[in-house]
Amino acid sequence: MGIAGSAPGLTDLRALLAALDPELDPVPKRFLHASHEKARTRMADALMMFREAEGTTLIVDVDEDNLGNERMLWARITLRVQSSLTAVGMMAAVSAALAKRGIPCNPVSAFLHDHLFVPWERRDDALDALSHLTP
């Protein structure tokens, strides 16, 4: 696959909400923060990486060996609708639906899909909220 630079996908809010098609990743995730130098050693394992002035944030799978040691586990819900990076309003509608139920959400937009990170223990509530979201 070559490198693509234009933003493919849907931009119409009604079409986006009608086709969200959320999918739960069965593996818990964790957010890590490390110095830029230390983060380089974990990048191959990272689902997502973002550099900030203070260091690098990584989202990684939680290993079964250290599952019990986590303070906060996160579930990833992928919105399988192919949304454009230029789409307006979809994440606002999704965030509002989750906020109405008191579910924290950390969204990440990738090139083809959007991903929601919600507390692991609220993952089923989040899926239910998304299933009731209407255009």
Language model features with spans:
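Phosphate/ribose-phosphate-bearing ligand recognition and processing surfaces
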Residues: 116
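Conserved short beta-strand edge segments in small beta-sheet-based binding/regulatory domains
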Residues: 75-82, 106-108, 134-135
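Structural preference for solvent-exposed beta-strand-turn elements
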Residues: 109-113, 122
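Helix N-cap motif at beta-to-alpha junctions
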Residues: 62-65, 119-125
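Charge-rich, low-aromatic oligomerization/scaffolding segments with amphipathic character
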Residues: 50-53, 123-135
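Generic non-transmembrane alpha-helical segments
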Residues: 94-97, 101-103, 129-133
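A short linear hydrophobic-aromatic micro-motif
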Residues: 45-47, 102-107
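Regulatory modules associated with amino-acid/nitrogen control
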Residues: 1-97
